[in-house]
Amino acid sequence: MSKRLPPLNALRVFDAAARHLSFTRAAEELFVTQAAVSHQIKSLEDFLGLKLFRRRNRSLLLTEEGQSYFLDIKEIFSQLTEATRKLQARSAKGALTVSLLPSFAIHWLVPRLSSFNSAYPGIDVRIQAVDRQEDKLADDVDVAIFYGRGNWPGLRVEKLYAEYLLPVCSPLLLTGEKPLKTPEDLAKHTLLHDASRRDWQTYTRQLGLNHINVQQGPIFSHSAMVLQAAIHGQGVALANNVMAQSEIEAGRLVCPFNDVLVSKNAFYLVCHDSQAELGKIAAFRQWILAKAAAEQEKFRFRYEQ
């Protein structure tokens, strides 16, 4: 009997596709194309000599063999992940300097950092908040979270968080004298702006809301102040999904409708390619990428093209 094992990459793709029951969602999680997912699944099915998926109408389903295989693979991946984490926790020690924008640090990383500290007590994380992002890593920085299009030559670049801009407001605005139920209702409410004012103009143009005056409403110099104004019922803000997520989960903000502005930018984890697998850096990469992927799956926005 052959002892040959299927390619690990094909198994990773199968695991993602089986969890989501969607090649598209699996591709998004793994940051590959849907065609690449289909190719890996076919190669795995050819290797095994049986079908793992079947289609019913427009739904993707596991075959009986695929379901059984998925349950076994899922357990193996879980054991592999835990074994890797334990090994890295023993070898990952020392100071780790993380550079990022203050807004991402305050709203996302810092509230979640305790779970990393618990898993890797030997690593001393040092947060370096920078108001202006450079296109290269400073000499005293181990890893950074960059915002942009992902084009930073000479660095290991891994997509961390896709960016959407979504309308958010206090729950009180949904049931007030002028309830906010559809995008057209924005004409009856104060718009909150950051210094550029561009976001509301782009958003209303995308939805064809030509009757809305995007010049009205107060301007704030920092995105954190825009969110606070929205929380206190002073108007409607266009918020970055990463920054607004915790406020929405806590119930202080709501997203009144699903029409969101899809950004061409995203947040990326970057480090020197030659150092990516070093103990403390590899541990942080694995932790933050898994954390971000799990949260985006739970907190996915629907949007209209």
Curated annotation (Swiss-Prot):
UniProt-recorded Gene Ontology molecular function terms: DNA-binding transcription factor activity; sequence-specific DNA binding
Signal sequence range: none
Subcellular location: Cytoplasm
Keywords: Activator, Cytoplasm, DNA-binding, Repressor, Transcription, Transcription regulation
Function: Regulatory protein for the glycine cleavage system operon (gcv). Mediates activation of gcv by glycine and repression by purines. GcvA is negatively autoregulated. Binds to three sites upstream of the gcv promoter.
Example of a GO biological process term: DNA-templated transcription
NCBIfam families according to UniProt: PRK11139.1 (NF008352)
PANTHER family noted in UniProt: GLYCINE CLEAVAGE SYSTEM TRANSCRIPTIONAL ACTIVATOR, HTH-TYPE TRANSCRIPTIONAL REGULATOR
GO cellular component: a single term: cytoplasm
InterPro entries xrefs: LysR_subst-bd, Tscrpt_reg_HTH_LysR, WH-like_DNA-bd_sf, WH_DNA-bd_sf
Record's protein name: Glycine cleavage system transcriptional activator
Domain HTH lysR-type: 6-63
DNA-binding interval(s): 23-42
Similarity comment text for this entry: Belongs to the LysR transcriptional regulatory family.
